[in-house]
């Protein structure tokens, strides 16, 4: 974390909210592969617990900040528990890099090394987990948000996605994977039918992406 970040952030946030705040705590959250993430607590007339996501120069997973922001935007005030968005900025002069700001969503990620970490609530948590994924998939996405995602996207949609991910796989591969290549050839020969309804899906089910409360 940059030594200047706490002072840079409080100057920005006080101007953004038009209120005076002081920093109580800034804590780096490790584990995110796409952006540096910080838990920030500030105090003014009230105490605010915030999450700051800062774009890195290089990361294990390359994603556009705007894509993440729009995905969260699509599920504000819905049955899907997403953080309340506050701001997004591409201006590097504010905090040294582009960033997103949101309210903290309470919960914690389970450690894969802790046995029976979800016990005794694993059945209920499992139901909630799959129910939330269902809510994501069936949600009608705001037209403006959807068109931003698909703008300049060639048709059919399946080919655009397959071309994109095949390129990612080939760029990241150190050798040819015969079984994987056979699967790719099969998908091109037997493409899915074009969907009449477009929706978002969540494709990363790792435990670090699932927050739970006791």
Predicted regions and their residues:
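Juxta-kinase regulatory segment immediately upstream of eukaryotic protein kinase catalytic domains
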Residues: 1-21
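ATP-binding pocket architecture of kinase catalytic cores
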Residues: 27-182, 190-197
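Catalytic-loop of the protein kinase fold
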Residues: 200-202, 207
């Amino acid at each position: 974390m940059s030594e200047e970040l706490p002072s840079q952030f409080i100057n920005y946030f006080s101007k953004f909210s038009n209120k005076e705040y002081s920093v109580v705590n800034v804590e780096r959250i490790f584990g995110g592969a796409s952006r540096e993430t910080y838990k920030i607590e500030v105090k003014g007339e009230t105490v605010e617990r915030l999450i700051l996501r800062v774009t890195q120069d290089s990361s294990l997973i390359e994603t556009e900040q705007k894509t993440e922001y729009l995905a969260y935007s699509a599920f504000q005030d819905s049955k899907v528990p997403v953080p309340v968005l506050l701001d997004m900025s591409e201006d590097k002069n504010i905090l040294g890099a582009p960033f997103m700001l949101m309210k903290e969503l309470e919960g914690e990620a389970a450690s894969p090394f802790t046995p029976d970490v979800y016990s005794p609530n694993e059945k209920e948590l499992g139901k909630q987990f799959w129910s939330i994924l269902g809510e994501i998939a069936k949600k009608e996405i705001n037209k403006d948000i959807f068109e931003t995602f698909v703008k300049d996207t060639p048709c059919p949609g399946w080919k655009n996605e397959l071309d994109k991910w095949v390129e990612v796989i080939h760029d990241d591969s150190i050798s040819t994977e015969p079984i994987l290549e056979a699967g790719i050839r099969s998908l091109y020969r037997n493409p899915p039918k074009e969907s009449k309804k477009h929706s978002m899906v969540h494709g990363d089910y790792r435990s670090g992406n699932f927050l739970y409360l006791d």
